[in-house]
Amino acid sequence: MAAVLQRVERLSNRVVRVLGCNPGPMTLQGTNTYLVGTGPRRILIDTGEPAIPEYISCLKQALTEFNTAIQEIVVTHWHRDHSGGIGDICKSINNDTTYCIKKLPRNPQREEIIGNGEQQYVYLKDGDVIKTEGATLRVLYTPGHTDDHMALLLEEENAIFSGDCILGEGTTVFEDLYDYMNSLKELLKIKADIIYPGHGPVIHNAEAKIQQYISHRNIREQQILTLFRENFEKSFTVMELVKIIYKNTPENLHEMAKHNLLLHLKKLEKEGKIFSNTDPDKKWKAHL
């Protein structure tokens, strides 16, 4: 069990974590939001969920304690537990100008409305740099968890704000495994020292953690490929594969296992290692 996270905690000279006060099975102890910089105006990364007054009061406490204000808001991805608090922050925390709220666009691009439509996103792109006193953040497009996911490299600390690409404990969920694995490999190349994750405690052995995430998925992939190689003339439905590969997993978890397995199959199909037919009862087979 991870140590209990404080609601407001200074993690370094330029990073303060404010906990989203929204604990749950997917959010762990809550969404980590971060005030980044050293000056009278700092960047806020992520905003927690909507309608969580405890979070707003923790954020106000942090701004008072560190004698600072919000320069702009950067959202790592569209999920509600990261973008949902924008409206409440704009309403409850006074600013002399309208907050600038930044994120990467959805892919394929689509209109995104914040709350009741009073605020609009300013869209970033991979490689953009966001600066404030004491901090330089470089945008890293890391799709996979979602199609618009970004991590941010804090250059002064060689640290990564990983959003939901990497968590402080356990593993994450993803929409596209092919993209997700490529994103992990890109993050590994940075050779970061620290990861400030979207949920859970700070990760001090950044490279080892990323490598662990990659290995975890590779082991499962090898298991799937071995099964296809040993049965290269056979084709399988997803549930047939689940019953073989997850045979030691309780049956009530097979639906979740099916979701994960399907993402692995789609990745392997993209790579030309297996193929599927177009029947209603889709079957998968080794690509010789």
Swiss-Prot record:
<feature type="binding site">
    <location>
        <position position="81"/>
    </location>
    <ligand>
        <name>Zn(2+) 2</name>
    </ligand>
</feature>
<feature type="modified residue" description="N6-acetyllysine">
    <location>
        <position position="102"/>
    </location>
</feature>
<feature type="binding site">
    <location>
        <position position="79"/>
    </location>
    <ligand>
        <name>Zn(2+) 1</name>
    </ligand>
</feature>
<keyword id="KW-0540">Nuclease</keyword>
<feature type="binding site">
    <location>
        <position position="164"/>
    </location>
    <ligand>
        <name>Zn(2+) 2</name>
    </ligand>
</feature>
<keyword id="KW-0007">Acetylation</keyword>
<comment type="function">
    <text>Endoribonuclease; cleaves preferentially 3' to purine-pyrimidine dinucleotide motifs in single-stranded RNA. The cleavage product contains a free 3' -OH group. Has no activity with double-stranded RNA or DNA. Required for normal mitochondrial function and cell viability.</text>
</comment>
<comment type="subunit">
    <text>Monomer.</text>
</comment>
<keyword id="KW-0496">Mitochondrion</keyword>
<feature type="binding site">
    <location>
        <position position="118"/>
    </location>
    <ligand>
        <name>Zn(2+) 2</name>
    </ligand>
</feature>
<keyword id="KW-0479">Metal-binding</keyword>
<comment type="similarity">
    <text>Belongs to the metallo-beta-lactamase superfamily. Glyoxalase II family.</text>
</comment>
<keyword id="KW-0694">RNA-binding</keyword>
<dbReference type="InterPro" id="IPR036866">
    <property type="entry name" value="RibonucZ/Hydroxyglut_hydro"/>
</dbReference>
<keyword id="KW-0255">Endonuclease</keyword>
<feature type="binding site">
    <location>
        <position position="164"/>
    </location>
    <ligand>
        <name>Zn(2+) 1</name>
    </ligand>
</feature>
<feature type="binding site">
    <location>
        <position position="118"/>
    </location>
    <ligand>
        <name>Zn(2+) 1</name>
    </ligand>
</feature>
<feature type="modified residue" description="N6-succinyllysine">
    <location>
        <position position="273"/>
    </location>
</feature>
<dbReference type="GO" id="GO:0005739">
    <property type="term" value="C:mitochondrion"/>
</dbReference>
<dbReference type="GO" id="GO:0008270">
    <property type="term" value="F:zinc ion binding"/>
</dbReference>
<dbReference type="InterPro" id="IPR050662">
    <property type="entry name" value="Sec-metab_biosynth-thioest"/>
</dbReference>
<feature type="binding site">
    <location>
        <position position="77"/>
    </location>
    <ligand>
        <name>Zn(2+) 1</name>
    </ligand>
</feature>
<feature type="binding site">
    <location>
        <position position="82"/>
    </location>
    <ligand>
        <name>Zn(2+) 2</name>
    </ligand>
</feature>
<dbReference type="InterPro" id="IPR036388">
    <property type="entry name" value="WH-like_DNA-bd_sf"/>
</dbReference>
<dbReference type="InterPro" id="IPR041516">
    <property type="entry name" value="LACTB2_WH"/>
</dbReference>
<feature type="binding site">
    <location>
        <position position="145"/>
    </location>
    <ligand>
        <name>Zn(2+) 1</name>
    </ligand>
</feature>
<keyword id="KW-0862">Zinc</keyword>
<dbReference type="GO" id="GO:0003727">
    <property type="term" value="F:single-stranded RNA binding"/>
</dbReference>
<feature type="modified residue" description="N6-acetyllysine">
    <location>
        <position position="282"/>
    </location>
</feature>
<feature type="binding site">
    <location>
        <position position="199"/>
    </location>
    <ligand>
        <name>Zn(2+) 2</name>
    </ligand>
</feature>
<dbReference type="Pfam" id="PF00753">
    <property type="entry name" value="Lactamase_B"/>
</dbReference>
<dbReference type="InterPro" id="IPR047921">
    <property type="entry name" value="LACTB2-like_MBL-fold"/>
</dbReference>
<dbReference type="GO" id="GO:0004521">
    <property type="term" value="F:RNA endonuclease activity"/>
</dbReference>
<dbReference type="Pfam" id="PF17778">
    <property type="entry name" value="BLACT_WH"/>
</dbReference>
<dbReference type="GO" id="GO:0005759">
    <property type="term" value="C:mitochondrial matrix"/>
</dbReference>
<keyword id="KW-0378">Hydrolase</keyword>
<protein>
    <recommendedName>
        <fullName>Endoribonuclease LACTB2</fullName>
        <ecNumber>3.1.27.-</ecNumber>
    </recommendedName>
</protein>
<keyword id="KW-0597">Phosphoprotein</keyword>
<dbReference type="InterPro" id="IPR001279">
    <property type="entry name" value="Metallo-B-lactamas"/>
</dbReference>
<feature type="modified residue" description="Phosphoserine">
    <location>
        <position position="235"/>
    </location>
</feature>
